[in-house]
């Protein structure tokens, strides 16, 4: 297997949509990914589009600030609004990469699934990453299928892959949805992210 990375185009800003179930570690993953890309000479902006959890934006801002990463947020209940205005803001302020942190949602919640579909349409992402906790069980495979149906994501980001977990179900997800694992979270720390090398 070859390692699958994000293939950046000249598009400004390059948009990465991050989605997943509740509790999969999306917000932390967005900051880790931003930090990773910043070290790769990109200029990322995170859009705070997780409006379901009251503390989500605060958590995102605290984590991002420590890494000196910019966050765009708004006083609104509409993530679509955040996304369209955030991309506009990125354009005006020469950010070359936008990372959208979306609310964790259950695949059986049709309202929220339709919402992420709409976020996808509005943001026209160049890359859609599905975040999966490596400790998940079999039901996660069904969830991944559903997300893929709605979003047709381009890659998987495995979180909490430290210590003993070999990411059994998560690896099954890869073959079931036929999408590459692009990044793995290797520790709780903000530099705990790596491009996935299938042969390791």
Model-derived segments and their meaning:
Residues 159:
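Phosphate-centric recognition/catalysis
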Residues 1-19, 24, 28-131, 135-143, ...:
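Nucleotide-state-sensitive switch-loop elements of NTP-binding domains
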């Amino acid at each position: 297997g070859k390692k699958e990375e994000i293939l950046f185009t000249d598009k400004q800003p390059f948009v990465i949509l991050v989605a997943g179930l509740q509790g999969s570690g999306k917000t932390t993953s967005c900051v880790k990914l931003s930090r990773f890309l910043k070290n790769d000479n990109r200029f990322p902006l995170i859009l705070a589009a997780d409006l379901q959890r009251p503390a989500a934006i605060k958590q995102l801002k605290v984590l991002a600030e420590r890494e000196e990463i910019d966050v765009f947020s708004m006083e609104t209940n509409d993530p679509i609004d955040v996304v369209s205005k955030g991309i506009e803001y990125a354009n005006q302020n020469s950010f070359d990469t936008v990372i959208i942190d979306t609310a964790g949602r259950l695949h059986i919640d049709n309202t929220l699934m339709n919402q992420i579909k709409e976020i996808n349409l509005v943001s026209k992402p160049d890359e859609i990453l599905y975040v999966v906790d490596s400790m998940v069980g079999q039901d996660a495979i069904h969830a991944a299928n559903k997300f893929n149906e709605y979003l047709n994501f381009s890659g998987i980001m495995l979180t909490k892959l430290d210590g003993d977990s070999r990411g059994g179900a998560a690896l099954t997800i890869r073959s079931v949805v036929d999408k590459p694992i692009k990044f793995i979270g290797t520790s709780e720390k903000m530099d705990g992210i790596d491009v996935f090398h299938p042969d390791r």
